[in-house]
């Protein structure tokens, strides 16, 4: 499906150790499964600082969430997705910059006056986001289409 870039030094630290070393495949798989997305049959491999995810998922939403759950991990700079989902589309991702908030991101993607749609972005990134105000520079978010 493609290779997606992430910021290696930004993200959630998992496993033991420190710095921005890539986590093990087992640690990444455990992190992915902890979100209870329905990714039990997804395989995770590591090649340097690139994570490779392979398998079938139930829908586009899970596919995109799996990519960002793995990519928003400290030490991962790229995610190669070999995931498949019914009626698959190219995902839209956004890398958070300093000074961003979900309202501002919503207006940038959906148009002026659509900042109140920030909740659509928040809901699309749960359970990786726990609160609309808890985003950080370098974090990658999925931007769903508006219905």
Predicted regions: what they are:
Residues 69, 73-87, 116-147:
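Extracellular LysM carbohydrate-binding repeats and other cell-envelope/extracellular binding modules
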Residues 48-52, 57, 86-113, 147:
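Primarily a LysM-type cell-wall glycan-binding module
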Residues 36, 74, 109-110, 125:
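A broad structural signal for alpha-helix termini and local helix breaks/kinks
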Residues 1-85:
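Secretory N-termini
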Residues 43-45, 52-54, 80-82, 93-97, ...:
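Soluble periplasmic/extracytoplasmic beta-strand elements of cell-envelope proteins
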